[in-house]
Amino acid sequence: MKDGFIKVAACSPKVVLADPKANADAIIAALHRAAAHGVRLAAFPELAMTGYTCGDLFMHELLLDSVETELLRIARETANLRLAAVIGAPIRCADKLYNCAVVISRGVILAVVPKAHMPNYGEFYELRHFAVPSRTELGSAAPYIDSLQTFFNPDGCIFSCTDYPDFRFGIEICEDLWVASPPSDKLAAAGALIIVNCSAGDEIIGKADYRKRITEVQSAKNICAYLYCGAGEGESTSDMVFSGHCFAYENGTLLAEKAPFDYANDMLITEIDLGRLLYDRRRVNSFCAGNAAHSGLFVDFSLGFGSCGPAPHEDLPETELTRRFPRNPFVPHDENELNARAKDILTIQALGLKRRLEHTHSMSAVIGISGGLDSALALLAAAKACDLMGIDRKFVHAVTMPCFGTTEHTKQNAVALCNSLGVTLHTIPIADSVRSHFRDIGHDETCHNVVYENAQARMRTLVLMDLANALNGLVVGTGDLSELALGWATYNGDHMSMYGVNAGIPKTLIKYVVRYYARHCENPALHDTLTAILETPISPELLPADEKGNIAQKTEDLVGPYELHDFFLYYVLRWGCPPAKLFRIAKQAFRESEFSNETILKWLKNFYRRFFNQQFKRNCLPDGPKVGSVCLSPRGDWRMPSDAVQRLWADEIQKLS
């Protein structure tokens, strides 16, 4: 439960039709197994106590009496488990029979929640046996079921853990999800962070994917987690087959899935990040948490971690993480999705630049080309902008400006790239200009300090700006999102342009966009050049090459691996992760990588230090298009004072090991 992680389970054990005792035995065994794994919330299918396909046997008192007896036994025999269980069962109330979910925790039946919408079409005929909950018949107060010693609430409940108040869940049953206005809408708006669905939907061709798509959208629009548990083996196959399909979504992202017909596996276990959900609800001010009318019960329960009220953070158990955290969160895992995203990124860049060029009546686009990844992507976007405007690519003026650290390899790549794309190429050596500047300010050329490096960067920007004036053009910036986060840019040097097309794209994603273009360009020379650029170490080339003429100054040796920094950037900006939680997630994500825990912590410290110290550069960024959900534009997504102090974050990092 530390860091906001709650372990949940969807359990679909083999059901024995019309035998509540046998089913209770299976449920008790499953709950003990789940508790051994640290599960805090366990869900079972719709009508799990009897099976969904009992037919007219649901009307028999003997069956219903047994259900109540066995529910009380489940409560007794799981009283020492620190979890809440949601179990489907037929329940009598006020002379009617209802299809319900029964919530049990620490030996107590907390409440009974009835299904709100009864399907009575196609293969379903639930109205034959079950009533629709109605306030007209039940009255304004929640009825009390003496035999179960608990309340029956037709308007649903929100269950809140007093030990950890962020742990709040609501329930809907099968068909409730499929209607135009599901109960989960109001439950989420009133504060529920997890929705449990006890289901018994039969399996037909295409239904599993459709079911997932509906759940994906429901969890995304309600900024909640959704735990779906479907009935499976043991149900009657007279007319239908039940697959035991179970899965969990978190804010539109699939966390885990037990595939349909996987009867050998009767339990799905994963972790839900409540902190992530809360952060997004606070961030999205249009989400109406706490403001929606909810007439149901708010039921408190304790898992025994706090003596009275919320437990101190140090007393909460640490949830073992099994969920997957991608090492490259900006990069889709699926190749088709990655290709589609790369195509969209290039289009966004090109359209943004096209609009700016047209608005300023520019006669050219001027770009500094280094032979590296960032300038290559900026040039590709500029070439595409020309194509969209229906003009010759000669409109783009690419400028190489070799100096002290330029290698023959990168210079050749830059020239080959420009020739392959058909843009106008300028080569303007700047070494003499920089030496003249050194003489003007009294700097020794043999002193390779920050003056030596930044003078070259600013000279390149000066050349680009003046050339743009001469050509009635606009300087296109090449700096990327990762560099902006770290402040890895010379202030008023490569930091400055007239429109930055790469400002919303992290370094780890840029290489995949360039790779996509290389694979789909149908130009062998361009493909080979882009491939060579992809294989070149990332470097500003501001220090002299080594004795073999190779790049000596490698960015990742100085500021750290971009794979780590982009990981940090994503979780800090997108989900507001504090350092301790971020370090924990990073260790999980990179546990099978070349990065040790010590290495991760080293660069995590560096990331926070640079992120805070370099905000002054971000606060005066040129315009540039937003591309993804993480962006650092001071006019949009990230507004932070340049003199904000990082002490709180630094102190937390200091405690890590």
Which role fits each region the language model picked out?
Residues 1-366, 384-393, 425:
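Enzyme catalytic cores with a strong preference for nitrogen-chemistry domains
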Residues 23, 165, 223-224, 233-236, ...:
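ATP/NTP-dependent adenylation/nucleotidyl-transfer catalytic domains that generate, transfer
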